[in-house]
C-alpha cells in the first residue's frame, strides 16, 4: 500500500519510492485504490494477457515481481495478489436487485434487456433522488443499448452522450457518434458510482462510456472485458466469393490523447480494487469522505 505525497509515492512506513525496475513512469504504474479501511491509497497495477477458456474462474498467480527502490537505499520485492474472475448471480426469480449497502442504494442487473425495462427505469428514477448511489455492472454482460440510454435519461433527467465515435469499416460509415462536434456534459449534483469488473461487457461498457460525460460519476473496480464492439461482420471475399465472418468490423475512436478504452483490454476504472470487494470498499470510501 502506498500514498502519493509532494515527495512522491511513499509506503506505509514513510519510505519514498525512487524507482521500480523496468517501469520508468511511476504514475503509469501506480493506480488509485482503496485501503481496507476505506481511504484512498495507491497500488502498482499490471495487466497481463489472460485466456478465457473456463480457467478464468480459478485463482491465478502473477509470475511477475516488482523490485521497488527507496530513497533510503532499501528495496522491496512485491508480488501480485491472486486473481480470479468475479460474477454474482441475481436473487432467484429476479431480473434486477435494488439493495442497500451502508445506506447507499445499489442497483444490479446482469443484462440490458427491454423485457424488464420498467424495473430498470424505476430504479434509475429512485436512485436519482439519492445523494450517493451505485450501479453494479460487475456481472453485466451487455444487451440493448437503448436500455442504457433510457437508464441515464431517468437518472439524470437529460440525454447523456458518449465520448467516443464508433465507425464501421464494412462498409465505411459512422455507427454512433455525438450529435455535436463537442460532446455536451450532463450535469449531476449527486454521486453515481459505477462498479466494474472483467465480466462487464458490450452494453455495460457503453454505459461506462456514457458515464464519462456525466458530472460526479466515478468508476470503481477492475478493467472491463474489452468487448464493446468486437462483433463479427459478414463480408464476401472478392476473388473466391466465399462468405466469411470477421470480427472488428467496427472500431471505437476515443478523443485524441485519451486511452481510457481499448478493445480486448476494456475500460480503466478511476479507482482500482478487486471486483469482489468494490461495493464494500466504495461504501467505506464514501463514509470517510463525508
Placement of each model-derived feature along the sequence:
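Low-complexity, Gly/Ser/Thr/Pro-rich intrinsically disordered linker/tail segments
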Residues: 260-290
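Sec-exported extracytoplasmic/periplasmic mature domains
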Residues: 19-22, 125-129, 153-160, 200, ...
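Extended C-terminal subregions enriched in glycine
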Residues: 191-213, 218-226
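Solvent-exposed loop/turn segments at secondary-structure junctions
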Residues: 24, 111-115, 139-145, 198-202, ...
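Extracytoplasmic/secreted envelope proteins and their assembly/folding machinery
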Residues: 117-124, 148-152, 192, 204-208, ...
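Flexible, low-complexity junctional segments that flank or bridge functional domains
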Residues: 1-132, 139-141, 288
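Structural recognition of the beta-strand scaffold that forms the well-ordered cores
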Residues: 105-108, 133-136, 191-196, 218-221, ...
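Gly/Ser/Thr-rich loop/hinge elements
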Residues: 141-191, 229-241, 248-254, 260-266
Amino acid at each position: 500500500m502506498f500514498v502519493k505525497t509532494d515527495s512522491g509515492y511513499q509506503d506505509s512506513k514513510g519510505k519514498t519510492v525512487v524507482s521500480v525496475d523496468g517501469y520508468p513512469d511511476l504514475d503509469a504504474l501506480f493506480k488509485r485504490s482503496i485501503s481496507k479501511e476505506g481511504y484512498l491509497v495507491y497500488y502498482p497495477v499490471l495487466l497481463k494477457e489472460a485466456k478465457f477458456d473456463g480457467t478464468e474462474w480459478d485463482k491465478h498467480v502473477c509470475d511477475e515481481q516488482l523490485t521497488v527502490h527507496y530513497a533510503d537505499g532499501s528495496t522491496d520485492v512485491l508480488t501480485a495478489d491472486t486473481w480470479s474472475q468475479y460474477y454474482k448471480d441475481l436473487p432467484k426469480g429476479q431480473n434486477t436487485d435494488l439493495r442497500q449497502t451502508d445506506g447507499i442504494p445499489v442497483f444490479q442487473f446482469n443484462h440490458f434487456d427491454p423485457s424488464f425495462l420498467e424495473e430498470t427505469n424505476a430504479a434509475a428514477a429512485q436512485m436519482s433522488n439519492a445523494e450517493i448511489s451505485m450501479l453494479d455492472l460487475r456481472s453485466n454482460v451487455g444487451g440493448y443499448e437503448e436500455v442504457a440510454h433510457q437508464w441515464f435519461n431517468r437518472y439524470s433527467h437529460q440525454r447523456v452522450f458518449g465520448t467516443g465515435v464508433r465507425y464501421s469499416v464494412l462498409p465505411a460509415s459512422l455507427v454512433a457518434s455525438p450529435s455535436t462536434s463537442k460532446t455536451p456534459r450532463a450535469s449531476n449534483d449527486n454521486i453515481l458510482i459505477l462498479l466494474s469488473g472483467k465480466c462487464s461487457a458490450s452494453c455495460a461498457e457503453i454505459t461506462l462510456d456514457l458515464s464519462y460525460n456525466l458530472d460526479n460519476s466515478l468508476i470503481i473496480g477492475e478493467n472491463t472485458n474489452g468487448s464493446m464492439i468486437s462483433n463479427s461482420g459478414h463480408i464476401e471475399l472478392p476473388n473466391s466469393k466465399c462468405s466469411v465472418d470477421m470480427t472488428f468490423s467496427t472500431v471505437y475512436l476515443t478523443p485524441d490523447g485519451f486511452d481510457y478504452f481499448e478493445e480486448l483490454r476494456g475500460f480503466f476504472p478511476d479507482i482500482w480494487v478487486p471486483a469482489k470487494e468494490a461495493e464494500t470498499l466504495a461504501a467505506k470510501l464514501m463514509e470517510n469522505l463525508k
